[in-house]
């Protein structure tokens, strides 16, 4: 049955229904209005975007956005930089502190301090719209982090360790801020508060290198951009972003079309889902950059060879065991090259450069290499299925926050399973 053509009134009614499907709760909506008022007072002239709830908070296009159109333009006065922090009440404490503090710590302390000030903070409209917690591995319990793929699990543990060390090494500085605080410094600058602030900066900042400051150490490249940080990532979207020295604004120009009432997206970079989960706390559906990483240790479980340890040492020394992966198109060039090198007798290892140039290792060794990679993928598939069963079991008795984390890992593992099955099929063709 064909669709009846709608008149103008019918089209408007359908558009209103489309818009209303994504309404956010009244509390978030009021906080969004407060943020717009705050930014307006700092020179922001408005945008064609409003806060909506899709599968989470995002910005909806009030009108169609064309390719080449300015998506958002945020004045420098609306950005939170280290210069913003140095001009605040914290500035005098930071400037006199030795050894010098890192830019990332300074931004984190600023967020914690401004949240502590509540409505007295000039930035309260922004702080109140930030999430209360995040779904990065820094928030995962040991039981949850153990469900991550090995490569991501290691990086997640390193993320937690970095945070603990940052908090521990900053205690003296935190105590020096006591004259500014209403409550004891150890309560205000707790590990949980620093974790929240660190994840806020890590997941929501834009890349915008700052001029070197004599009061800070290390690179200063992260800037918080209120409103702009509500734009979500989609891998297939293209934008042009950067600070415009003429307008003195950070600008994002869309390179693709966004229909009216649809969510407006930007692109955080060509990241696979493991990187997105680690750095931003989410996974993207249909991510063309996603792969499954292969840990070199798996070769010890599969290959029976008296010279394997020597071969692995050689590959490690020449950086051939880094970034081994499987995509939906099959094993990566690096994975196949590593396995082909493992197929060679030790006496032939002087030929390794020829293998890198694509020289064949011989029909028998090529068949051995393909069988070995198939075994690797099958071993990874078995592990993926096992972990998915464990996740489903954990979901039955998880807390709300833990459930959110488990669902993300479940999505990651399901994608992993699809990639491995597809990669195995490619080898069988």
Regions found by a protein language model. Name each.
Residues 89-95, 426:
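Secreted, disulfide-rich extracellular signaling modules
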Residues 2-78, 83-86, 114-429:
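Long, positively charged leader/targeting segments at protein N-termini
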Residues 79-80, 96-100, 104-117:
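Hydrophobic or amphipathic alpha-helical targeting/insertion segments
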């Amino acid at each position: 049955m064909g669709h009846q053509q709608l008149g103008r009134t019918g089209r408007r009614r359908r558009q209103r229904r489309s818009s209303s499907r994504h309404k956010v709760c009244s509390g978030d909506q009021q906080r969004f209005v407060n943020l717009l008022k705050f930014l307006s007072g700092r020179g922001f002239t408005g945008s064609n975007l409003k806060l909506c709830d899709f599968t989470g908070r995002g910005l909806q296009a009030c009108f169609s956005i064309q390719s080449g159109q300015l998506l958002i333009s945020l004045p420098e006065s609306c950005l939170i930089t280290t210069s913003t922090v140095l001009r605040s009440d914290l500035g005098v404490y930071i400037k006199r502190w030795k050894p010098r503090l890192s830019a990332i710590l300074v931004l984190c302390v600023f967020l914690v301090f401004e949240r502590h000030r509540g409505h007295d903070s000039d930035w309260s409209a922004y702080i109140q719209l930030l999430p209360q917690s995040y779904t990065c591995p820094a928030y995962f319990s040991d039981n949850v982090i153990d469900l991550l793929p090995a490569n991501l699990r290691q990086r997640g543990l390193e993320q937690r360790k970095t945070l603990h060390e940052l908090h521990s090494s900053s205690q003296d500085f935190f105590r020096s801020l006591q004259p500014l605080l209403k409550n004891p410094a150890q309560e205000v600058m707790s590990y949980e508060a620093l974790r929240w602030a660190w994840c806020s900066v890590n997941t929501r900042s834009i890349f915008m290198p700052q001029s070197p400051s004599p009061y800070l150490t290390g690179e200063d490249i992260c800037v918080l951009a209120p409103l702009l940080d509500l734009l979500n990532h989609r891998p297939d979207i293209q934008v042009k972003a950067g600070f415009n020295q003429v307008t003195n604004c950070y600008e994002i120009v869309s390179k693709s079309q966004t229909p009216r009432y649809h969510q407006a997206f930007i692109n955080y970079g060509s990241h696979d889902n493991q990187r997105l989960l680690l750095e931003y706390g989410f996974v993207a559906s249909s991510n063309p950059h996603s792969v499954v990483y292969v840990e070199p240790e798996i070769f010890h479980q599969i290959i029976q060879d008296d010279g394997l340890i020597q071969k692995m040492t050689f590959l490690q020394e020449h950086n051939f065991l880094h970034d081994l992966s499987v995509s939906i198109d099959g094993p990566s060039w690096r994975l196949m090259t590593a396995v082909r090198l493992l197929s060679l007798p030790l006496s032939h290892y002087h030929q390794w450069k020829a293998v890198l140039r694509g020289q064949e290792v011989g029909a028998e060794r090529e068949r051995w290499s393909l069988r070995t990679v198939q075994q690797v993928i099958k071993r990874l598939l078995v592990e993926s299925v096992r972990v998915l069963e464990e996740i489903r079991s954990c979901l039955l008795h998880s807390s709300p926050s833990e459930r959110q984390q488990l669902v993300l890992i479940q999505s990651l593992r399901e994608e992993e399973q699809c990639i491995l099955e597809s990669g195995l099929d490619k080898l069988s063709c």
